[in-house]
């Protein structure tokens, strides 16, 4: 794992989760923010999210509990939460899907989109569609 992504757990207190531990970890939490960076060798923005994610957690002053996907779990989470692009932030309430933000955004976009996601009712995530992966930057 790249040192900047590892620092999410080691320095910033993000709890690492796998496909086997996410449900148990997220269920008791009010709102969890699952950070899924992607492979820095293949995803140019992955390290940007590793820098921005701790700042988002600080900005929301305890409203979200930070989690980080292990590299081995990222593709599983992609299928489970239906996103096509990395990096991504997935928001869960008591382990249930609220929404996701793909790619890197302007700070003002995060500050507008995250509160809107946090107000949503839990729902099923979108189904993963491979064809959505080309050029789609919309939030789910």
What are these model-predicted stretches?
Residues 64-80, 84-87, 102-105:
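Charged, surface-exposed interaction regions in soluble eukaryotic proteins
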Residues 90-131:
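Non-catalytic, surface beta->alpha helical segment in thiol-disulfide oxidoreductase systems
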Residues 46-50, 111:
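Conserved strand-to-helix beginnings and helix N-cap segments that scaffold or border functional pockets
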Residues 16, 36-38, 49, 54-75:
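Thiol-based oxidoreductase modules, predominantly thioredoxin-like and allied folds used
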Residues 45-46, 100:
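Alpha-helix N-cap/helix-start motif
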């Amino acid at each position: 794992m790249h040192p900047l992504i590892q620092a999410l757990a080691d320095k910033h207190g993000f709890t690492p989760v796998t496909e086997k531990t996410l449900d148990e970890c997220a269920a008791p939490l009010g709102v969890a923010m699952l950070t899924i960076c992607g492979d820095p060798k293949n995803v140019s923005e992955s390290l940007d999210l590793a820098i921005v994610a701790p700042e988002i957690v600080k900005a929301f002053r305890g409203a979200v509990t930070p989690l980080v996907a292990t590299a081995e779990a990222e593709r599983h989470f992609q299928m489970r939460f239906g996103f096509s692009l990395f990096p991504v932030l997935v928001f869960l309430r008591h382990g249930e899907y609220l929404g996701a933000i793909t790619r890197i955004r302007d700070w003002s976009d995060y500050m507008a989109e995250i509160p809107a996601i946090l107000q949503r009712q839990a729902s099923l995530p979108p189904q993963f569609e491979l064809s959505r992966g080309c050029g789609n930057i919309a939030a789910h």
